[in-house]
């Protein structure tokens, strides 16, 4: 009698065959993700396809949590899985254990992971950035010895700020040996006592620029004591070196612009400073001239004796007061002596007279000494003031042969204020002279 199998029995048998085949327990598959879904449980359901075929796939939550990227529709992936049968539907499918992006996608995945790691460790913090010197004396340029990058940097620096010294350090920027060469050249440039380092190269694919994403290159830039400008690739290219550098330039040309001031802008600033300073000096000189003219016209400087007449009079008054005080004291003493003579016996009179004479003599000596000291001090003070005033006096200056030149009742302080045939007046120590200017000679001509 013929025996028929149930659908379930056949499906279980086929599943048993799949599960027992060692070649199906670990297969490596390359394909594109499609119909991707993430279940609320954390499991992933999707298809893996190529141009000719499609296979169903699922990935349990435990394995999905270990992925280094977020899978999405259209990703090209490399998968490690086992092949089995889903009994309920009778479909064969793959159960994915590991999955990673294929090719360039894998590089982007690696880049993103390293970027997150370095950012978390503080390598990209703004507080670690160093300022780029405004007026550098030396700039080290690290790039390939040939190519557009080095030409653009050198020509831009020469046009903007030719005073700076450029130190070209030929550096490998692509290939297996470039990573170590970049590290060594940055360390070498840091030892040269330059003001700024430019690290750059032209554009390229992510593979071409990858050396500037290497972790040890990033850390070398971070540890550099000299400010670094990163100019790797074109404006749309970003590397980890850009994030860790003190400044990121979109292109090598922009790096040269950031590193140097514009000589033409500096010249304009210098001219503006020169104009401002010149105007200030002229204003200051004019103010001082006005002050001098004002002081020179003061009436006491025209008659210096007016400055010390009061002091002389005050000294004479003090002298009269001292003499009067002395005479008054002497008269009082004489009167007192007379009273004593009348009050005491004649026998004691000589003794009393002698004592009074001594007292009067001592008093007279003290008063004379006080008066002499006061008069001497006053004479010294007066003499010093007279000497100071005479030194400032225009009259004293004229006694040495100088004359004051006046034109239209104003003091002439410069030959630039005179012209031929001008009528002038020369004031001397004993009078004045009217004269006519025949010729003007200036020292600066």
From Swiss-Prot:
The lineage of its organism: Bacteria, Bacillati, Bacillota, Bacilli, Bacillales. Keywords: Cytoplasm, Exonuclease, Hydrolase, Nuclease. GO terms for biological process: DNA catabolic process. This is Exodeoxyribonuclease 7 large subunit. Belongs to the XseA family. Pfam families: Exonuc_VII_L (PF02601), tRNA_anti_2 (PF13742). One of its GO terms (cellular component) is exodeoxyribonuclease VII complex. GO terms for molecular function: exodeoxyribonuclease VII activity; nucleic acid binding. It comes from Staphylococcus epidermidis (strain ATCC 12228 / FDA PCI 1200). HAMAP family: Exonuc_7_L. Its main location: cytoplasm. Coiled coil: none annotated. InterPro entries: Exonuc_VII_L (IPR003753), Exonuc_VII_lsu_C (IPR020579), OB-fold_nuc-bd_dom (IPR025824). PANTHER family: EXODEOXYRIBONUCLEASE 7 LARGE SUBUNIT (PTHR30008:SF0). The keyword Nuclease applies. Its EC number is 3.1.11.6.
């Amino acid at each position: 009698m013929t025996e028929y199998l149930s659908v379930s029995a056949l499906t279980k048998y086929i599943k048993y065959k799949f599960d027992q085949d060692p070649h199906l327990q670990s297969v490596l598959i390359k394909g594109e993700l499609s119909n991707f879904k993430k279940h609320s449980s954390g499991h992933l359901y999707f298809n893996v396809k190529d141009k000719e075929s499609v296979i169903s796939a699922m990935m349990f939550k435990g394995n999905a949590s270990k992925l280094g990227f977020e899978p999405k529709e259209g990703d090209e992936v490399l998968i490690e899985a086992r092949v089995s049968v889903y009994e309920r539907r009778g479909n064969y499918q793959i159960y994915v254990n590991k999955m990673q992006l294929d090719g360039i996608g894998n590089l982007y995945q690696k880049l993103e992971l390293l970027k997150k790691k370095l950012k978390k460790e503080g390598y990209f913090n703004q507080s670690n950035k160093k300022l780029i010197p405004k007026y550098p004396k030396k700039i080290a340029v690290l790039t390939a010895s040939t190519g557009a990058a080095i030409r653009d940097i050198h020509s831009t620096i020469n046009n903007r700020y030719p005073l700076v010294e450029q130190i070209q350090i030929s550096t490998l920027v692509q290939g297996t040996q470039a990573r170590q060469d970049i590290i060594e050249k940055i360390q070498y440039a840091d030892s040269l006592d330059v003001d700024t380092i430019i690290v750059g190269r032209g554009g390229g694919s992510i593979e071409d620029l990858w050396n500037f994403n290497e972790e040890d290159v990033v850390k070398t830039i971070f540890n550099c004591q000299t400010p670094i400008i990163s100019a790797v690739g074109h404006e749309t290219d970003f590397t980890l070196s850009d994030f860790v550098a003190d400044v990121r330039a979109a292109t090598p040309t922009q790096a040269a612009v950031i590193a140097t001031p514009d000589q033409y802008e500096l010249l304009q600033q210098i001219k503006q400073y020169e104009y401002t300073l010149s105007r200030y000096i002229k204003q200051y000189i004019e103010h001082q001239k006005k002050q001098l003219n004002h002081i020179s016209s003061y009436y006491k400087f025209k008659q210096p004796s007016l400055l010390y007449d009061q002091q002389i009079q005050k000294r004479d008054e003090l002298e009269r007061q001292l003499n009067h005080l002395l005479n008054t004291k002497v008269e009082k003493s004489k009167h007192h002596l007379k009273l004593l003579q009348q009050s005491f016996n004649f026998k004691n009179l000589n003794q009393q007279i002698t004592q009074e004479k001594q007292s009067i003599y001592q008093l007279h000596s003290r008063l004379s000494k006080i008066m002499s000291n006061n008069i001497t001090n006053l004479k010294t003070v007066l003499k010093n003031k007279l000497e100071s005033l005479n030194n400032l006096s225009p009259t004293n200056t004229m006694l040495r042969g100088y004359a004051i030149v006046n034109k239209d009742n104003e003091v002439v302080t410069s030959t630039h204020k005179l012209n031929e045939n001008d009528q002038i007046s020369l004031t001397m120590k004993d009078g004045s002279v009217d004269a006519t200017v025949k010729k003007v000679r200036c020292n600066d001509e």
